[in-house]
Structure formats: C-alpha cells, structure tokens
Regions:
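Active-site pocket-lining segments that scaffold enzyme catalytic pockets across diverse folds
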Residues: 97-157
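ATP-dependent adenylate-handling ligase core
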Residues: 309
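Extended, charge-enriched "interface" segments that sit outside catalytic cores
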Residues: 1-116, 132
Length: 319
C-alpha cells in the first residue's frame, strides 16, 4: 500500500493534473502517470538502488541525478556493447577451457559471475578518465584466475603451469603456494590514460586481505601527495557469505571515516552465488542482503543481476 498514490491523499482525478517538480526526476512539470512511469523504470527494472539510509542530502542528490529521469536509461554505444560481449566471451571461454583441460582440479571458477570482468574493465577505464593513477584490488579465490588472465594480463602460460605444479615466477618465496592465492601487477591503458593495477596476494582466510589493501592505498596516497584521495582507488571483491559473516568487514567499515584511516572511499563488489560453501543464505545472516553491513558507513548499495552485463557495467560506471 505504501507504493500507491492513494496512500498519500491522491485521487484518480489527480493522475492527469500537472505538478511542478523543479527538475526532480529530470523534468520541470509532470503528472502522476509520468512520475510513476519514471519511478517504475528506475526502481522496478534491472537495478535495485539503496541510498535513502545515507545522511548527507548532497550525496543522495548526486545519486538521484545519475539514475532518475526519462533520459537515464542504461545506454551503450555499439562499440561499448561489443567490448562488453568480448570480455564476457573471454571470461566464459577461459572457464570452459580450464574445465575441459583440467577436469576436477580446484580452480574456484567465475561461472555465472562473468560480468565481473567487464565491470572491472569499466572501473579501470572510468578511473583513468577521472585522474586515477593506480587501482589496488583485493579479492577471494572465486574468479581470481579469470581476473588474473583477463584483467591483469597474466600470461596463460604462467597460469597453466601452476595447474601442473610448476611456478613461472621470479618470486622464489612464493613457490609452492596455490594458484588462487597469488597476486600480480600490470599497467593498462585506456583512452590514452595509463593506470597501474595490482592484485594483492592473499591467504585462504577470507577477507583478511581487506585491511592490507586499504593500508596500501593509504600509503600510496601519501607518496602521491594525494590529499583529495582520488589518484589511488581500492577495489575489494567478496563472496556473499564472507561479506556478511566475517567481522573484519564490519571493522574496516567502522574505521573508514576516521582521520587516520580514511582513504576517500572503496568500491566493494559482492559476487553473490547464494551459498557460502554449504550454507544457504537463510542460515548465514539475519538481514535480507549480505550488503547490509555496508550501511555502517552509510554507503550506497546497488543490487544488479549478473546475467545482465550491461546493467552491471552501468553500476560500475556510477561507482
């Protein structure tokens, strides 16, 4: 009933009456029919937005300006769509090859979450356009090999050698570690902007890498003399169960606004495969969504289906 205009005193004859909106929803005047059409298109389609819990009116307006309005569709050029498709094909082809070539070998595939790859590409491209010089990534096992191959540019030879128990690396200290613990670094160039990307090594302990990445970012910002905290971007990826269940996640959010720990914000990506090892969501958390922990820091949250890669990339662009 809260979604019906009648709840707020509107009657049927009000549906065609013009209302002055002063730019809200991207229009100056609109009747209830037009307003409802825009609201349904924005909030009842491919992306679910949570931002009304945020305390800063300017931050809420910033998000509204980018999602509400008759012209705020998810739009990509022909080349943009081809780039997204190309990355999806690369991600899926990589997983299929590993499944055929190394049957039964533990690899923590990205099956079903392939949209993560074009989303990361968008973050790198958009970040470079906005002046970012470095992107620090921390992530769990799930999809790590795919990210190493298709985002970081790690040679396939090195990845496949690790399946045979061989290490192609100058880092002798890392020999013998499992392939989905290893990190990498590389330089990527988009639109003439060079961005250095590094994926931090991490142990089997889920989410333990988070404060390491955040500390690296803080140090890099210091060396870049980046007082506005815009040159180095942290990106942390999570599984749904670990994000809600590991206390270190809440601790990092609780410290994020403190003067000694503030890094200007973090992009978090939750790859939600609806299960934590063997635990169903209803046995894993008390809240509806795993992302509810992020409300500690009044962070905006976007819910998007992984089978809609254009919507996923659109969210990455806003982030």
């Amino acid at each position: 009933p809260e979604l019906r205009p009648e709840t707020y005193g509107f009657s049927k004859k009000d549906y065609d009456r013009k209302i002055f909106l002063d730019g809200v929803l991207g229009i100056q005047y609109g009747n209830l029919k037009e307003i409802l059409k825009i609201l349904k298109k924005t909030y009842c389609s491919n992306i679910g937005y949570e931002f009304m819990h945020m305390g800063d009116p300017d931050e809420k307006s910033w998000i509204r300006d980018r999602i509400e309005g008759p012209e705020k569709d998810i739009k990509f050029t022909e080349n943009g769509k081809k780039a997204i498709l190309n990355k999806i094909i690369q991600a899926e082809g990589f997983e299929k090859y590993l499944h055929v070539k190394f049957v039964g070998t533990k690899r923590f595939g990205l099956d079903g979450g392939e949209s993560l790859i074009p989303a990361l590409e968008q973050i790198i491209k958009r970040g470079g356009n906005l002046g970012a010089k470095e992107i620090k990534i921390g992530m769990p096992h799930r999809g790590r090999l795919n990210v190493l191959a298709n985002v970081m540019g790690k040679p396939f030879k090195a990845i496949f050698s690790e399946f045979f128990g061989k290490t192609v690396s100058s880092k002798k200290d890392f020999e013998g570690d499992v392939k989905y613990h290893l990190g990498a670094s590389s330089n990527r160039e988009f639109d003439g902007n060079s961005v250095h990307i590094s994926l931090t090594d991490n142990p089997s302990h889920l989410e333990a890498v988070n404060p390491v990445v955040l500390g690296q970012v803080r140090a890099k910002q210091f060396f870049h003399k980046d007082k506005e905290r815009k040159k180095v971007i942290p990106v942390l990826m999570h599984g749904d169960a670990a994000f809600a269940g590991q206390g270190i996640v809440a601790e990092c959010f609780a410290m994020s606004g403190l003067p000694g720990h503030n890094i200007g914000g973090t992009i978090h990506i939750i790859v939600n495969n609806q299960i934590g090892f063997t635990t169903a969501p209803r046995f894993a958390r008390s809240s509806p969504y795993p992302s509810d922990v992020a409300k500690i820091a009044q962070a905006p949250i976007f819910h998007v289906n992984g089978d809609n890669p254009e919507a996923v990339v659109h969210c990455a662009k806003i982030a």
